[in-house]
Amino acid sequence: MAEISAKMVQELREKTGAGMMDCKKALTEAGGDLVKAEEVLRKKGLSAAAKKTGRAATEGAVASYIHMGGKIGVLVEVNCETDFVARTEGFQGLVKEIAMQIAAASPRWVRREEVPADVVAKELEIAKAQAREQKKPEAILEKIATGKVEKFYSEFCLMEQAWVKDDKKKIQDVLTDAVAKIGENIQIRRFARFVLGEGLEKKQENLAEEVAKAAGLQK
């Protein structure tokens, strides 16, 4: 068992706002891993961030981010509790980081609860079919499929994606850190990601025909 030092307890307390004993218990349960201990506190509703999530967040900002010379654009709405916080540098910086994440990582939904049931069912079906193709035992197909769906969530649900600036953190962790630091409930409400030409068929013309047209040989 990992030794839990006073410094570790203090660090977790400063990060989460939870009590000293709760922090020590969480660290013990997590084997000394600070990130896992933070998750333990959140699940038990003991962290400051967890306590703030029930508060209404109706202020905030809608921000845009344009990447790669105008080829990718993002609009995102992030909510907080007060207009004062919405105008702060810390909150505005957070919104920009989230917009950049969306541009870089191409999520489809904010959280897993938004994924349509038919999409989840299809992913399960595909995962099972792949497992059968690999001659996996029928008894473990469900477990394999569930694992594949979890991976699907981590790839396409924004809150579960690895942060592009630090892949040891998920976006949920980034948000939790911001809540603890800023002191208000913060929620990512919705986003839209645009890619130039996405869904359009580019017209492919024959090179010889293009030359002929340029030379005035074809009408």
From Swiss-Prot:
SUPFAM superfamilies associated with the record: Elongation factor Ts (EF-Ts), dimerisation domain (SSF54713), UBA-like (SSF46934)
| UniProt subcellular location | Cytoplasm
Task: Report whether Isomerase shows up as a keyword of the record.
Answer: no
Question: What keywords are annotated for this sequence in UniProt?
Answer: Cytoplasm, Elongation factor, Protein biosynthesis
A GO MF annotation of the entry reads:
translation elongation factor activity
GO CC terms on record?
cytoplasm
Where do the segments described as Involved in Mg(2+) ion dislocation from EF-Tu lie?
82-85
Q: Which CDD domains match?
A: UBA_EF-Ts (cd14275)
Q: What does this protein do?
A: Associates with the EF-Tu.GDP complex and induces the exchange of GDP to GTP. It remains bound to the aminoacyl-tRNA.EF-Tu.GTP complex up to the GTP hydrolysis stage on the ribosome.
Q: What is this protein called?
A: Elongation factor Ts
Organism whose genome encodes this protein: Anaeromyxobacter dehalogenans (strain 2CP-C)
| Lineage, top ranks | Bacteria, Pseudomonadati, Myxococcota, Myxococcia, Myxococcales
Q: Which gene encodes it?
A: tsf
